[in-house]
UniProtKB/Swiss-Prot annotation:
InterPro entries: AB_hydrolase_fold, PGAP1-ab_dom-like, PGAP1/BST1, PGAP1_TMD. Its EC number is 3.1.-.-. It is an enzyme of class 3 (hydrolase). The gene is bst1. Belongs to the GPI inositol-deacylase family. GO terms for biological process: GPI anchor biosynthetic process; protein transport. Involved in inositol deacylation of GPI-anchored proteins which plays important roles in the quality control and ER-associated degradation of GPI-anchored proteins. The keyword Mitochondrion does not apply. This is GPI inositol-deacylase. Residues 1-95 are annotated as: Disordered.
Length: 1156
């Protein structure tokens, strides 16, 4: 006779253990008025006599006998009655001759001990899987409340208004059919196009009309090449309407932009590292082909005197920006073929998801290459020396890629690139979402104008030198208020001679503020002079704000601002020095001559703030603003404000020199104090026009705030402008403007979780800065208050911790499984998932959360964080202090110990999510089980033994082995192992459906054990499924586009074999054998390791969660195969087909009952 698993509902192989019949006594026990479980308890002595079992614990002579197959016992049928009697009376039965051939279906007897723990679980073994304890219910309720408010906060987050204009375009896409398989192996998968604006760009079939600098657009993850049409259309129209009519710019080398674009067939590079590398390889081949087109005079209309282009400007959206950076690291990259990269909403710092090992390792290789290149001391050793990288982020409106990931401060020094937000760009001042960043009208105009400014076709590189390009990009993309913003005043020579009569009263007293409420109130131009304070006075700053535009030299507007110094007359030769002479002396001989510089180029645009203003992006003329430190004006004695209006004109000017002691307020104190008490301050009536409030403690991107500004006793009719507020941080360059400010929602992209440290470690964090422009002439005080927005802050967790909600629940599942197996190995009862969760909540779960909370706090406060297990170390020069770019990969990824409480919060939410998923799975299984039962009873016959126990039908062992072998061969050759995992999940679902139906039909402990066990394994596999599903989507997409090249990195058979073997074994209904020796601790250790890893590394390296679960499955397979004395002989017999009768009933074993 053969042994079965403890509580296994499966029929043993026919040739080893034929189907058995029931004795009359046993049959009576299963009558309608008797409880099967009472029979099981009352007949334990008989059970011990009838069967044998395999026990992994040592035989110390004190083992408690355990039942073999719960209370529903079968006596082996045979042609000899004496044989049956002998087996029934035997106190100990040795293994049959075929026992060593048994497949992994070993069993143990259920214990008959009377320990409190055993009694407790014996009394609860009938507990329904739907049962939920009060503790679990309360935990789920609290978690649901948290989750509700988080989702609600995220949906109503502080994202700002959508104010993008709609672009106008007439697109035509020309397919570059010549770029075929002779040039690239990806010709059948990807395509290259050229954009032509209908009615603007010249082209025909013979001549493509290439006349400018080549630009290549790279779409993002699952993006379309047609997204470039708004940018390309603006480039064509701007050149046609503006640039071509400016002869000075034409002579300076400015030409049109020839926009090419790549059709990646909507490939999903964000989910698959190999796809990212394939796209980068194709980009380099496309660049080589594009440059070759300019050598063909039949396709180009370029001036033959101009050099042929040697480089291409790359513009990448989303993952297209990563592809652009990757292209420069590939072996087929032509040196210096790319020197300018502009990316939009590209996740440079970290991959959007870490579910694929290839994408994580590819990111590491790319970022390490860029960091190492810029760490070189000499330019000759830096292959990226001439490359500028500009990363533009959309801000809070982007819910696809966290804008924090767009930061390149950990990759590129400030001399070669920077990160900026669209809300900072002058005349844009708006946050955009992930898709609208490619077509937003205000933004596309800024992008195209900046590109035209860096073009110089007189150079082979088609662009100006790197330093000049960086200066232009800063001018176009930064507000001009940043510390790194450059001022051109000191670099210019005086070009205007200003002549004033000596007795002029236009010179204001030192320190007096200039206020003009109207321009042209006197006939003719008028000059106002503000004396520059003497050098050595610390903290002085000049500021000027007006609603007029600054005139450049020679223009005829209403206002011109000059910085002047006294110019002595030298024999009347001054006229040949200056290009502009402004004489206000009236012809008097006694006059003062000033040599002046025009400040228009340093003018800064600010959004107009009036009592009628609503948004900073309103289509109205912006304010003009000038700001200089006193050190910048060391060469000048006067600031001249020239009112050139001939007649009274509506307009105003406000200018002054202010002290930093009055204009700058630094708020001391930590984050805790600000959170508890908030911030309140009053600005006096005699304050400067610009007041700056710096709060270093506010630097986290996880917190939102409410800012309120209240003005007292102010007269709107006398007010020159309404209060204007700028919120800013320095790294990355993020500024937000608020007009007509009253109440403000404040959120920022400062210090974010999991972000690598910058290349140059900052001594202190600058925090957030608020710059407030108010009209000081009103004589009113201003109250400023700031407090934390708790409800708004909850929504920030979604974007920053999205992957946490996939990793932390696996911690809960691992602890539940650990508790289930501990109780199973001790008592023989496999408790339900809900009961295991309740037990974990009362024991290991709080302890683990406490440990993780302490770890999170210590990681954030530790000055030297140990490097992670992943070898992500960037080699640096021996003389430099190495930077660990992975130090923020652990746990919460937070650099602030204040947020330690997020660990228990996420743990609490994970419990609720697991409970919800458990009940969703139970509902699904119940529905499918009901359908399964209906289909089974409609077959006409019901297979039942005499006691009414349905047979758990299963395929033969040989068939299971063949199925497994076929699937593994396919994995090693054609399909990725992720597809096999999905198949395993489906098979496990079917096993759970059958197990639940049998458990309901038989109401036996054996079937309940297996049903609970199969259900818990299914829950574990469900949490692993999202890690595999993304790569599976990439593979399926490749099949759709007829790309059949297999993934070289996803055919590791060992990555899926344990899961396949485990699932195939469970299809037979085999309950996993109990482990009662010290080896049972191996199960606990593996599950505990999965729980800890899920919390510590699960966000940054989520792909390893699959492999850890795979190790657990391998351990379960080992328990299955070797607990029953598995031998190669049994395997050979199965391959020979000796199991042909397995699962078939014999006449004496069961009968077939006709369906009524």
């Amino acid at each position: 006779m053969h042994r079965r698993s403890s509580g296994s509902p499966v029929e043993d192989d026919a040739e080893d253990s034929p189907l058995v019949s029931r004795s009359p006594t046993e049959s009576t026990a299963h009558g309608p008025n008797n409880n099967a479980f009472e029979t099981a308890e009352k007949s334990r002595s008989q059970i011990a006599k009838r069967g044998t079992s395999f026990d992994l614990r040592r035989d110390n002579g004190a083992s408690t006998p355990r039942s073999r197959n719960s209370g529903l016992w079968r006596t082996p049928s045979s042609s000899s009655t004496s044989s049956t009697t002998a087996m029934a009376t035997a106190s100990t039965e040795t293994k049959s001759s075929s026992a060593s051939f048994l497949m992994p279906l070993a069993s143990q007897r259920l214990p008959m001990g009377t320990s409190p723990e055993s009694s407790r679980f014996r009394s609860s073994r009938l507990r329904s899987p739907w049962t939920c304890s009060i503790l679990t219910a309360l935990t789920t309720l609290v978690a649901s409340v948290f989750l509700f408010f988080i989702v609600r906060s995220f949906s109503a987050r502080q994202a700002g208004e959508d104010g993008c204009g709609i672009p106008v375009m007439s697109p035509t896409f020309l397919h570059m059919v010549g770029f075929d398989t002779e040039h690239t192996r990806f010709a059948s998968k990807y395509n290259l196009y050229l954009y032509r604006e209908e009615g603007v760009d010249f082209y025909n079939q013979e001549n493509l009309g290439l006349n400018g600098a080549p630009v290549l657009f790279l779409p993002g993850n699952a993006g379309s090449y047609r997204q470039v049409r708004s940018l390309a259309a603006e480039a064509s129209r701007h050149f046609h309407d503006v640039v071509r009519h400016d002869q000075e710019r034409i002579k300076a080398g400015t030409r049109s932009l020839d926009f090419f674009m790549i059709d990646f067939n909507e490939d999903m590079a964000a989910f698959h590292g190999q796809t990212l590398l394939d796209q980068a390889e194709y980009v380099n081949e496309a660049i080589a082909y594009i440059l070759s087109l300019y050598h063909d005079p039949k396709r180009s209309r370029r001036d033959p005197e101009l050099p042929d282009p040697s480089s291409v400007i790359l513009i990448g959206h989303s993952m297209g920006g990563i592809v652009a950076r990757t292209a420069l690291t590939m072996s087929n990259y032509q040196a210096n073929s790319v020197n300018t990269i502009v990316t939009m909403s590209a996740p440079h710092a970290k991959p959007p998801v870490s579910f694929d090992s290839d994408i994580v390792h590819t990111y590491k290789q790319i970022n390490d290459y860029w960091r190492e290149a810029y760490s070189q001391t000499w330019a000759n050793n830096n292959p990226l020396w001439h490359v500028t990288l500009i990363s533009i982020a959309g801000g809070s409106r982007d819910t696809v890629v966290p804008s924090d990931y767009a930061s390149i401060s950990s990759l590129v020094p400030e001399t070669h690139g920077f990160t900026v937000f669209t809300s900072s760009i002058p005349d844009v001042w708006i946050g955009v979402d992930h898709l609208s960043i490619t077509w937003c009208d205000q933004f596309r105009k800024a992008i195209i104008k900046s590109l035209f400014d860096i073009i110089d076709v007189r150079r082979a590189s088609q662009t100006k030198p790197r330093a000049e390009r960086m200066r232009i990009f800063k001018k176009w993309y930064l507000t001009g208020l940043e510390p790194v913003a450059e001022r051109t005043l000191s670099q210019k020579e005086p070009n205007t001679l200003l002549t004033l009569e000596d007795k002029s009263n236009s010179i204001l007293p030192q320190g007096q503020r200039l206020i003009l409420r109207e321009l042209g109130h006197r006939s003719g131009p008028k000059v106002y002079l503000l004396p520059v304070p003497p050098q050595g006075v610390s903290g002085k700053k000049f500021t000027l704000l007006t609603d007029q535009r600054f005139d450049k030299t020679g223009e005829h507007g209403n206002l011109e601002v000059l910085f002047c110094s006294v110019f002595p007359l030298q024999n009347g030769k001054f006229a040949t020095v200056f290009s502009m002479n402004m004489d206000f002396s009236g012809g008097n001989t006694g006059s003062t001559r000033l040599a002046c510089k025009n400040a228009a180029e340093d003018g800064i645009h600010l959004p107009a703030s009036t009592p009628a203003s609503k948004y900073p992006f309103d289509r109205v003329q912006p304010f003009s603003y000038l700001q200089y430190e006193l050190e910048d004006l060391s060469e000048h004695q006067f600031v001249a404000i020239v009112d050139k209006a001939d007649s009274p004109t509506k307009g105003w000017v406000l200018a002054e020199f202010s002290d930093s002691s009055d204009a700058v307020i630094r708020v001391r104190g930590g984050l805790g104090g600000l959170l508890s008490a908030g911030l309140k301050m009053r600005l006096p009536a005699n304050r400067p026009m610009l007041t700056e409030i710096k709060i270093p403690a506010l630097h986290s991107s996880l917190l939102d705030y409410k800012l309120q500004i209240v003005r007292h006793n102010h007269d709107k009719r006398q007010e020159l402008f309404a209060p204007l507020l700028r919120q800013s941080i320095s790294d990355p360059h993020e500024s937000k403007f608020f007009v007509n400010v009253d109440k403000v929602d404040v959120n920022l992209h400062g210090v974010a979780p999991f972000m690598p440290p910058p290349l140059r470690e900052q001594a202190t964090l600058g925090g957030v800065s608020f710059q407030l422009w108010t009209d000081p002439s009103c004589g009113s005080t201003v109250d400023v208050s700031l407090k934390v927005d708790i409800a708004g802050s909850l929504g920030e967790l979604v974007m920053r911790y999205r992957t946490v909600f996939a990793a932390f629940p696996l911690l809960v599942v691992a602890l539940v499984l650990r508790k289930q197996f501990q109780m199973y190995d001790e008592t023989g009862y496999f408790i339900t998932f809900a009961e295991g969760l309740d037990t974990a909540l009362r024991s290991s779960f709080p302890i683990l959360l406490l440990a993780m909370s302490l770890l999170a706090s210590s990681l954030a406060t530790s000055a030297q964080i140990p490097p992670s297990d992943e070898p992500f170390q960037w080699p640096v020069n021996a003389t430099e202090t190495p930077i660990d770019f992975t130090k923020n990969d652990l746990l919460l990824g937070s650099q602030d110990a204040f947020f330690w409480f997020l660990v228990p919060v996420f743990g609490l939410i994970s419990v609720g999510v697991c409970v919800i998923l458990n009940y969703i799975a139970l509902i699904l299984l119940s529905v499918l089980s009901f359908i399964y039962g209906c289909l089974r009873t409609r077959s006409g016959y019901i297979k039942r033994n005499e006691k009414g126990t349905p047979i758990f039908s299963a395929p033969t062992a040989r068939r299971r082995m063949i199925n497994t072998a076929i699937l593994l061969v396919l994995v090693s050759t054609l399909i990725p192992y992720q597809f096999a995992y999905m198949v395993a999940c489906i098979v496990q679902l079917a096993t759970c459906v059958r197990a639940q139906w049998h458990a309901k039909e038989t109401r036996s402990t054996a079937h309940y054990n297996f049903s609970n066990y199969a259900h818990s394994i299914f829950i574990l596999m469900l949490w692993i499924l999202p890690i595999n599903i993304l790569v599976l989507l990439v593979w399926a997409h490749n099949l759709v586009v007829h790309w059949f090249m297999p993934f070289s990195s996803h055919h590791n058979v060992l990555s899926i074999m344990p899961f396949i073997l485990l699932v195939e074994t469970m299809t037979s209904g085999a309950m996993i054998p109990r482990v009662t020796t010290r080896l049972k601790h191996v199960t606990s250790m593996i599950l505990f390791a999965i729980a800890v890893y899920s919390a510590v590394y699960g966000v940054s390296y989520a792909y390893l969660l699959h492999h850890l679960a795979n190790i657990l499955a391998a351990w379960f397979v080992v328990i299955y195969f070797f607990s029953s004395g598995f031998s190669l002989r049994r395997l050979w017999l199965i391959l020979e087909g000796d199991d042909a009768t397995q699962g078939k009933s014999e006449p004496g074993g069961s009968h077939q009952k006709k369906k009524p």
